[in-house]
C-alpha cells in the first residue's frame, strides 16, 4: 500500500510540495494487468496504464515490464535519455519505499550494479559512438553489389549462367541490407534518433521492400524479453514447431499434435528457411501496413518494387522478374533464418522468470566465433551477447566490449557461450530434435 510522505512546512498553498507516495514491490507487482500497468525506473514509480498506447516503441514492449524494474531496459533502448525523461514526468506517481531494495524479486543487487558500471565504462570508452565511414562503406558495398547484378545482365545477357550470378549477387545485397537496416533500426548510427529512423525507412523500405514500423514492433519485443513465450514474437511458431524444454512437454501432456513434432528437425528444411521471408514475412508485412494504415512505410515498400521491376523487366519481362524476385527471397530467407536462429534457438526458451537484464539476455543468446567472414556473413550478429546487452552500440565496437562482458559473466558464474559457425548451425537442428523428442515422450505418456 502506498505511504504518503511529509510535506514541507511554512509554505504557501501554491508553493507546497506534494508529498511523494511510496510503494512496496508487492503493491507494484499487482499492477501488471492489461489496463493497469506500473513500472519502476531508477526507483521512481510510473503509471503507464494509458500512456502505453502512445509509447513510440509500441505498447507491447513497455507493457512487458509492467510490475517490474525497467531501469536497465530503459537505458538499453533510449540513447537520448534526457529527452525521453520528459515523457516520464507526467506519469510519475511516487517512489519505492525507503525500506525496499532497488531490484525486485530477489535479484542479485551487486551483479546488477556491476553491470550498470560496465555500461558506464562502455560510455566512457565512447563505444556508443559510431564510425560514419564504416556505415558509409557498408551502404556503398550493398549498392555496388546491386549495380554489379545489373552489369551482369547488361553485358552478359540473360542466359542461365548470368541469371544465376544475378540471383547470387542480389541475395548477397539483400542479406547485407538486412543487417544494415538492423543498425539504423537500433538507433546505433546517428546521434539523432530522427536520422536513424529516416535512413532506416530508406534501407528497409526502398532497398528491401519491408516496413520499418513492422520490424520495430517485432524486434524490440524480442530484445526486451528474448526467448520468453508470449513476449518474444520470434518464439511464436504458430504451432508449427515446439521449442525449448517446457513447451514440448506442455503440448504433449495436453495431447496437442498439429504436426508430428518429433520430426520437426526434418520438416524444418521444408517450411522453415524456404518460406519465412518469401511467404510468412511478406504476407505479414503487407497485411500489417494496410491494417494499421501505415501509408508512409507502404510508400517506401512500393518504391522498392517499382525500382526492382523497372530494373529487371527489360531483361526478363514481368513473369521472369517475379521469378527472379522470389528466387532472391528464397535464398535470402535461408541465410537469414540460419544466422538468426543459431544465436537463440539452442538456448533457454521459457515462460517469464523475471530475471535481471544480464541473466535474461545471456540465458537466451550465444555467440559465434569472430572472424572476417563470420562478422560479414552475420552482420556482426555473431556478437549476439554484446548486441543484446547493448542494443544501441554500433556493431563495430562489439569486439571492444566483449572481453569486459566475459569478465563480468565469469565473476558471477553466468554462462557466456561461444561456438564455431558449424556448431551454431548444427545446434539449431539438435535443439529442434531434442524438443521434438520431449514432446513425443510427453504425448505418449499423457
UniProtKB/Swiss-Prot annotation:
Primary localisation category: endoplasmic reticulum
Extent of motif Histidine box-2: 219-223
Membrane-related topology note: Multi-pass membrane protein
Start and end residues of each Cytochrome b5 heme-binding domain: 20-97
Keyword presence, Lipid biosynthesis: yes
Molecular function in Gene Ontology: oxidoreductase activity, acting on paired donors, with oxidation of a pair of donors resulting in the reduction of molecular oxygen to two molecules of water
Short motif (Histidine box-1): ranges: 182-186
PROSITE patterns for this protein: CYTOCHROME_B5_2 (PS50255)
EC number, as in UniProt: 1.14.19.-
Lumenal topological domain: 154, 287-307
GO cellular component entries: endoplasmic reticulum membrane
Keywords tagged on the record: Electron transport, Endoplasmic reticulum, Fatty acid biosynthesis, Fatty acid metabolism, Lipid biosynthesis, Lipid metabolism, Membrane, Oxidoreductase, Transmembrane, Transmembrane helix, Transport
Topology feature Cytoplasmic, residues: 1-132, 176-265, 329-446
Histidine box-3, short sequence motif: residues: 384-388
Chain ranges passing through the membrane: 133-153, 155-175, 266-286, 308-328
Location(s) in or outside the cell: Endoplasmic reticulum membrane
Entry similarity comment: Belongs to the fatty acid desaturase type 1 family.
Record note on domains: The histidine box domains may contain the active site and/or be involved in metal ion binding.
Protein name: Fatty acid desaturase 2
Gene name in the database record: fads2
Amino acid at each position: 500500500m502506498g505511504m504518503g510522505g511529509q510535506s514541507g512546512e511554512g509554505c504557501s498553498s501554491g508553493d507546497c510540495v506534494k508529498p511523494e507516495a511510496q510503494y512496496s514491490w508487492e503493491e507494484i507487482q499487482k499492477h501488471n494487468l492489461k489496463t493497469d500497468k506500473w513500472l519502476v525506473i531508477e526507483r521512481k514509480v510510473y503509471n503507464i496504464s494509458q500512456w502505453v498506447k502512445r509509447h513510440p516503441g509500441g505498447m507491447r514492449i513497455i507493457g512487458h515490464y509492467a510490475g517490474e524494474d525497467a531501469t536497465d531496459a530503459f537505458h538499453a533502448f533510449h540513447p537520448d535519455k534526457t529527452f525521453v525523461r520528459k515523457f516520464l514526468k507526467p506519469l510519475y506517481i511516487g517512489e519505492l519505499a525507503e525500506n525496499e531494495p532497488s531490484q525486485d524479486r530477489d535479484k542479485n543487487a551487486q551483479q546488477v550494479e556491476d553491470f550498470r558500471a560496465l555500461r558506464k565504462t562502455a560510455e566512457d570508452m565512447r563505444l556508443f559512438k559510431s564510425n560514419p565511414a564504416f556505415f558509409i562503406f557498408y551502404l556503398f558495398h550493398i549498392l555496388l553489389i546491386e549495380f554489379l547484378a545489373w552489369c551482369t545482365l547488361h553485358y552478359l545477357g540473360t542466359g542461365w549462367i548470368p541469371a544465376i550470378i544475378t540471383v547470387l549477387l542480389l541475395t548477397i545485397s539483400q542479406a547485407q541490407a538486412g543487417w544494415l537496416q538492423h543498425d539504423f533500426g537500433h538507433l546505433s548510427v546517428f546521434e539523432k534518433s530522427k536520422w536513424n529512423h529516416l535512413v532506416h525507412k530508406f534501407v528497409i523500405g526502398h532497398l528491401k521492400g519491408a516496413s520499418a514500423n513492422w520490424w520495430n514492433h517485432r524486434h524490440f519485443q524480442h530484445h526486451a524479453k528474448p526467448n520468453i513465450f508470449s513476449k518474444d514474437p520470434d518464439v511464436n511458431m504458430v504451432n508449427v514447431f515446439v521449442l525449448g524444454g517446457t513447451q514440448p512437454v506442455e503440448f504433449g501432456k495436453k495431447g496437442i499434435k498439429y504436426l508430428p513434432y518429433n520430426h520437426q528437425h526434418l520438416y524444418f528444411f521444408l517450411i522453415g528457411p524456404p518460406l519465412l521471408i518469401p511467404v510468412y514475412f511478406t504476407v505479414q508485412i503487407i497485411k500489417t501496413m494496410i491494417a494499421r494504415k501505415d501509408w508512409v512505410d507502404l510508400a517506401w515498400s512500393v518504391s522498392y518494387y517499382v525500382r526492382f521491376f523497372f530494373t529487371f523487366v527489360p531483361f526478363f519481362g514481368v513473369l521472369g522478374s517475379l521469378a527472379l524476385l522470389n528466387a532472391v527471397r528464397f535464398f535470402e530467407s535461408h541465410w537469414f533464418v540460419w544466422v538468426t536462429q543459431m544465436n537463440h534457438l539452442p538456448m533457454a526458451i521459457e515462460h517469464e522468470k523475471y530475471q535481471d537484464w544480464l541473466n535474461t539476455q545471456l540465458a537466451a543468446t550465444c555467440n559465434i566465433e569472430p572472424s572476417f567472414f563470420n562478422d560479414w556473413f552475420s552482420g556482426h550478429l555473431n556478437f549476439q551477447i554484446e548486441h543484446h546487452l547493448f542494443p544501441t552500440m554500433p556493431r563495430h565496437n562489439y569486439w571492444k566490449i566483449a572481453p569486459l562482458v566475459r569478465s563480468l559473466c565469469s565473476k558471477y558464474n553466468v554462462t557466456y557461450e561461444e561456438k564455431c559457425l558449424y556448431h551454431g548451425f548444427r545446434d539449431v537442428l539438435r535443439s529442434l530434435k531434442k524438443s521434438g523428442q520431449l514432446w513425443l515422450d510427453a504425448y505418449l505418456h499423457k
